[in-house]
Swiss-Prot record:
This protein's name: D-threonate kinase
Gene3D superfamilies according to UniProt: Four-carbon acid sugar kinase, nucleotide binding domain, Putative sugar-binding, N-terminal domain
Job of this protein: Catalyzes the ATP-dependent phosphorylation of D-threonate to D-threonate 4-phosphate. Can also phosphorylate 4-hydroxy-L-threonine, with lower efficiency.
Residues given in the record as substrate binding sites: 17, 60, 90-93
NCBIfam families: ThrnKinDtnkGamma
InterPro entries: 4-carb_acid_sugar_kinase_N, 4-carb_acid_sugar_kinase_N_sf, NBD_C, NBD_C_sf
UniProt key word Nucleotide-binding: yes
EC number(s) per entry: 2.7.1.219
Top-rank EC class of the record's enzyme: transferase
Residue positions binding ATP: 254, 375-378, 421
Keywords, sorted A to Z: ATP-binding, Carbohydrate metabolism, Kinase, Nucleotide-binding, Transferase
Superkingdom of origin organism: Bacteria
Length: 442
C-alpha cells in the first residue's frame, strides 16, 4: 500500500447531544481550529464551515430511524455547502444512544469504504479491551451507565451494540495489533475484504494518535467513530494554525509544575516557538552575546507569525537545584531571582525594540500582539524594563489572568497579561493565545 498522507482539510463532527458536541469541539478549538456548533442543519451555510463544524442531531434518545435520518442529513448538509475533509461520528464513550443506526447512516452518507471505531477516552478512564468498553477499571455493564434511566446499555461489547441496529460486516483489532507499525496496511486489508466497521482497542491516548496516523496514511479518508478522545487525537494530527499578524510574546519565569504544563499544552500548536534560557549563561562573560542570540531567535519567530514563549525552567528538577546553584555562584536565593528577573526584563525590551525597528514606515509601529508575563517577579521586572509607571486593568482571561495596558511604556496599547506562576490549569496559556488572536482580528 502506498504511503499516502492525507492533507488537513476541514472536519465535520456529528454528535448526538449538545454536551457531547462541545466535548468533541473543544479539543479541536484548543489546537487552533475555528469551530462552530450547529443545532439545525437548515441553518448551516458556507460561512460557518471554518476549520471544523460540529452538528448536534439531538438524537441519543430518538427512535433509531429518526436518528439515522438526522445523521445522514447532517453529513449531506455539510457536503452541500462545500464541506470537504474528515468526518467524525461522535458517539458516547459508554455506548449510549443509537450506535448502529447512526454509524451506518454516517458511513453511507459519507460514501467511504470503512468506519474506524475507537470509542475510548483514556484521559477520562474509558478504554477498550478485546472490543469491550471499560470505565475506570470496571466493565461497562458493571457501572451505573448500564442502568441509565433514558438510554440504558445492555452490553459492553461494541460489536454487539452495533449489531442491534446494523448488519454491516464488523472486525475487531485488539491492542497488540493496534500498536503495530503496519496498522494502516491491516486497515486497508480489512477494507479490501469487505469489512465496513473496524473496532479498535485503545488503552492510552497515544493509541488513538496511532490510529489517526494510520487513518491518515490510507488512500481514502475513513469515517472516524469515537468520543472526545478521538477528536483530540485528530486535532493533534491536523495543522489548524495560521500565520498570526501580531503574535504573542510570553515570558515565563515561574518554575511551578502547572506553568510547565501550560507551556507543554501550548507547544502542541505548530505556530508556537519556544526560546529556552540557560541560567548558567546569564553569569558567563558572554552573557551579552547570549542575549543577542536569544533576541534574534525570538524576533525570527515573531516575524514569521509564530507565538514565542521564553522560559527559564526546562525540567521539573530545576526547582530542587536552586540552593546548589546559589552556592556555586555565591548568591542568595533573592539575588539569583533578581538577576534572572532583570535579565528577562532586558531581553524583553531588546526584543520589543528590535521588532519595532523593522516597521516599514515610521508612522505605524510594529509590536507583539500581546505580552504574557508569568511569575510575579518576572512581571514587574519586565514592566519596569519597558518603562511602565503603572497598569490599567481591562479584564480577565480564564479566571486567573488579568489583562490590560502598561502605562507610559514603550509597548503603548499592546495588551499585557499577567499570571501568578501557580495559577490556572493546563489550557490557560492556550486560552491566552486565543484571546490575543481574537483581539488582533477585531
Amino acid at each position: 500500500m502506498p504511503n499516502v498522507q492525507q492533507s488537513a482539510g476541514q472536519v465535520l463532527v456529528v454528535a448526538d447531544d449538545f454536551t457531547g458536541a462541545n466535548d468533541a469541539g473543544v479539543g479541536l478549538a484548543q489546537h487552533g481550529a475555528r469551530v462552530s456548533v450547529v443545532f439545525d442543519v437548515n441553518t448551516l451555510h458556507a460561512d460557518l464551515l471554518g476549520d471544523a463544524v460540529v452538528i448536534n442531531t439531538d438524537s441519543r434518545a430518538a427512535r433509531d430511524d429518526v436518528a439515522s435520518q438526522r445523521t445522514a442529513a447532517a453529513v449531506a448538509a455539510w457536503q452541500a455547502v462545500g464541506g470537504k475533509g474528515w468526518i467524525i461520528k461522535k458517539i458516547d464513550s459508554t455506548l449510549r444512544g443509537n450506535l448502529g443506526a447512526e454509524v451506518a447512516a454516517a458511513l453511507s452518507a459519507a460514501d467511504v469504504p470503512v468506519a474506524l471505531i475507537a470509542a475510548a477516552s483514556p484521559t477520562l478512564g474509558r478504554v477498550t479491551r478485546q472490543g469491550e468498553v471499560w470505565v475506570n477499571g470496571r466493565r461497562l455493564t458493571d457501572t451505573e451507565f448500564a442502568s441509565d434511566p433514558k438510554t440504558p446499555v445492555t452490553s459492553a461489547s461494541i460489536a454487539a451494540r452495533l449489531a442491534e441496529q446494523t448488519a454491516l460486516p464488523v472486525a475487531e483489532i485488539h491492542l497488540d495489533e493496534v500498536r503495530q507499525a503496519n496498522l494502516a496496511h491491516r486497515l486497508q486489508q480489512l477494507a479490501d475484504e469487505g469489512t465496513r466497521l473496524i473496532i479498535l482497542d485503545t488503552d492510552v491516548q497515544d493509541d488513538l494518535t496511532h490510529i489517526v496516523n494510520a487513518a491518515r496514511a490510507l488512500p481514502f479518508r475513513p469515517l472516524l467513530v469515537g468520543s472526545a478522545g478521538l477528536s483530540d487525537a485528530l486535532a493533534t494530527a491536523q495543522d489548524f494554525t495560521r500565520k498570526t499578524e501580531k503574535p504573542l510574546l510570553a515570558v515565563v519565569g515561574s518554575m511551578s509544575d502547572i506553568a510547565q504544563k501550560q507551556i507543554a499544552a501550548a507547544r502542541l500548536r505548530s505556530d508556537v516557538t519556544l526560546v529556552e534560557i540557560d541560567i548558567n549563561a546569564l553569569f558567563s562573560p558572554d552573557s551579552s552575546t547570549v542575549m543577542a542570540s536569544q533576541c534574534e531567535d525570538a524576533l525570527k519567530a515573531l516575524t514569521n507569525g509564530h507565538h514565542c514563549i521564553i522560559r527559564t525552567c526546562h525540567n521539573e528538577n530545576q526547582r530542587f537545584e536552586i540552593d546548589a546553584r546559589c552556592r556555586e555562584l555565591g548568591l542568595s536565593r533573592q539575588q539569583l531571582g533578581e538577576t534572572i528577573s532583570h535579565y528577562l526584563g532586558e531581553l524583553t525590551r531588546s526584543i520589543v525594540q528590535a521588532l519595532d525597528s523593522l516597521a516599514a514606515d515610521g508612522t505605524r509601529r510594529r509590536l507583539p500582539g500581546g505580552l504574557y508575563l508569568s511569575g510575579g517577579d518576572i512581571a514587574i521586572a519586565v514592566a519596569t524594563a519597558l518603562g511602565a509607571t503603572g497598569f490599567q486593568i481591562k479584564g480577565q482571561i480564564a479566571s486567573c489572568v488579568p489583562w490590560g495596558y502598561l502605562l507610559n511604556s514603550i509597548v503603548g496599547m499592546t495588551p499585557v497579561m499577567t499570571k501568578a506562576g501557580g495559577f490556572g490549569n493546563e489550557t490557560t496559556l492556550l486560552d491566552v493565545l486565543r484571546f490575543i488572536e481574537e483581539k488582533v482580528s477585531e
